Regions:
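Short glycine-rich phosphate-binding loop at a beta-alpha junction
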Residues: 54-61, 148-152, 157-161
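Active-site signature of alpha/beta-hydrolase-fold catalytic machinery across serine-
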Residues: 71, 169-173
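Generic structural signal for well-ordered alpha-helical scaffold segments
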Residues: 43-47, 130, 134-145, 171
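GST superfamily/GST-like fold recognition
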Residues: 164-168
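Active-site-proximal alpha-helix that buttresses catalytic centers in soluble enzyme cores
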Residues: 8, 13, 17-76
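Domain-level recognition of soluble alpha/beta enzyme cores
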Residues: 175-202
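Phosphate-handling substructures
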Residues: 33, 75-132
């Protein structure tokens, strides 16, 4: 393929601040709302994204991500794809709890030491979590390939509003040298992954 200059970028957004973020509670699939107004921490991001063109927008179907999209780009709320695969890991019985509340639980300690081998009670295994993110990534790569082929030489940007664990997984999948724990993205922050057709073997 000769159009290697037709870059595609994934702009990954972590949802804004919730009360549980401040209380350092596991949220997972719990449908928590953002803090109101400036407390959500999204004002700088809203300014940064104002007027930016996107080739597509994807969003976790959980309330805190929907509200984030509504605040940062309300013009896209009706066109975005709301995908449950973009949810955070399901922490099961540990949701709503803090590290301090769980630190003496033997299963929790084992999970902290090796989350690939242990699963939260009533929660989601590491394998299931990784598999659904990988499934989404494959579809997004196909979309990116189509954008690269049809592009005019300018980067096409896909916006993904999601959660910290999902962002870490996508970064790990797209960056061979990256580890899941390398990404430390705070609520309301952005991570940009720049793809090139020649880098992906298209």
């Amino acid at each position: 393929m000769n159009n290697s200059n037709n870059g595609v970028e994934w702009w990954l957004i972590r949802h804004g601040v919730t009360a549980w973020n401040l209380q350092r509670k596991y949220q997972g699939h719990s449908d928590e709302e953002l803090l109101p107004g400036e407390a959500s921490g999204l004002t700088p991001l809203r300014s940064k994204l104002a007027g930016q063109s996107f080739a597509g927008v994807y969003c976790s179907d959980l309330k805190r991500c929907r509200q984030t999209l509504q605040l940062i780009r309300p013009d896209w709320t009706g066109q975005a794809v709301y995908d449950p695969r973009l949810r955070e890991m399901n922490f099961g019985a540990w949701e709503g709890k803090t590290y301090e509340m769980l630190e003496h639980n033997p299963l929790y300690r084992a999970w902290i030491d090796d989350p690939k081998l242990h699963t939260p009670p009533e929660g989601e295994s590491w394998e299931l979590f990784q598999n659904r993110i990988t499934d989404f990534q494959r579809e997004l790569l196909q979309k990116s390939k189509e954008l690269a082929v049809s592009g005019n030489g300018n980067p096409s940007i896909l916006l993904i509003v999601t959660h910290g664990g999902v962002m870490s997984t996508l970064n790990m999948l797209m960056s061979p040298d990256a580890d899941f724990w390398d990404s430390k993205v705070l609520p309301g922050e952005i991570m940009k992954l720049k793809l090139r057709s020649n880098e992906l073997g298209w």
